Amino acid sequence: MINGRKTSPLPGHSGGLPELEARLARELTMLERPAKPWVPRSYLDRCEVLDVAVIGAGLCGLTALAALSFAGIDNIRAFDRAPSGREGPWVTSARMETLRTRKDLAGPALGVPSLTFRAWFEAQFGTRAYEEMTLIPREAWMAYMVWYRNVLALPVSNETNLVGLGLREDGLLALNFMGPEGPVEVVARRVVLATGLDGLGAPRMPDVAKTVSGRFVRHSGDVFDMSVWRGKRVAVVGAGASAMDNAAAALEAGAARVDLFIRRTDIPRVEKFGGVASLGMTHGYIGLPDADRWAFMVEAERTQIPPPRHSVLRVSRHENAFFHLGSPVLKLTEAGDTVEIETPKGHYPADLLIFATGFDVDFGRRPEFSALNDRVLLWRDAYQPPVGQGNDALGSYPYLGPAFEFLPKPGLSAAEAAAISRVHCFAYPAVPSHGKITSGIPAVSPGAERLAQGIARSFFVEDRARHFETFMSHAVAEITGEEWRDADAQDKIKEHTDG
């Protein structure tokens, strides 16, 4: 079913993908991708050190792996806690029917036409089905990402959860995982955190949410079965896309009623970044002075991103959906198996509250990143905004370098500082530093290429002695000396003979 219309794969569609994959292989060959491996291998106690460990194998993680591979960096691997085919939010916590992104964006294709979602979709369902599809169903996107991983042979270890990241004295990074067969230890030269929206923190829950038993409270990013709330009263706090998605999912699952409590007196209507979306913004934002980058982000936070129109209509079409504007939740009171919600406009009973209130960046709430806590430079450390433009949430985001690398706080030892700068944040918290590159599908390819090029540059500089040694010892002759005749030498031979 594609956007309300029953759609079947084309007859013989099993041959559609092989044909596409053959075309993709030819395109990659013509582009010389992946490039020839060039990074010298490193060893520790006779064990090979991984060049790049990528934490997360969702959209950003897979695109990062592909970009690194295309750049000739092949000693790489991603690790994801989810089973194969369930990485990212698409078939777990996401509750929208379709992606919010336009279907024609190139996404993670890295400039390769046959690697696009469109090519994958049309190979199976045809051009007409693609043209009739308005937006991409999230399940189809997940299937595409599985194909993307497989067709590029990207190395991923699933069901492998990071439990600790350590900074070694020699500048290497120690990673401790819990895998399906027990603990796993990995040492890497670089680490890329591709951990999504909550990649450096946890769901943001207002203090009022903590005043009642946890059995009444969920966050929109949690994975839970909405069907258990059939016939129940569900309250959703928030007005963004995830609030609408959760409200709609509850209604479609048979909730008796859904109340949306919205702090603002109106739902945001204008996506400010939509007015400047361009390759100029993608490539230029990183070059802006801090004051300008901060001004963009503060205004975006102030106005907020509106939910898609179709997401709001998905809720409002239900007669048992109720929007309460200008209604911040002031107090929650347990009353047996229900909770009473108090707002400035009244009291409302509910059986479940879903807070669609975003995510915080807080290393302290992620034990696996304890080595980074208070060692990574944050925006509040690097920039002092003018009066009236302060924003504590934005101030907690990492202040990143040009290749998404963390920058060390002043006062660290040389070894600590070096190790910190070898961890790269290719996740949502990179947005204040790099712009909307890691926030979704539209600019993920330019972002991954920036990441890969930066890591490649750092490897070459770090290994420069080994490269220079190779340069000096290279003695493969391109020509033998038999390809020409020295005219002057021939004249001298002739003179000697004539004499």
Where are these regions (language model features)?
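Tryptophan-centered motif/residue detector
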Residues: 86-93, 120, 147, 363
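Flavin (primarily FAD) cofactor-binding/catalytic cores of flavoenzymes
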Residues: 2-82, 130-241, 245-253, 259-499
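A broadly structural signal marking compact, well-ordered functional cores
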Residues: 76-81, 104-121, 347
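A conserved beta-strand/loop capping segment in the N-terminal third of enzymes
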Residues: 108-142
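Conserved N-terminal glycine-rich FAD pyrophosphate-binding loop of Rossmann-like flavoproteins
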Residues: 82-109, 268-284
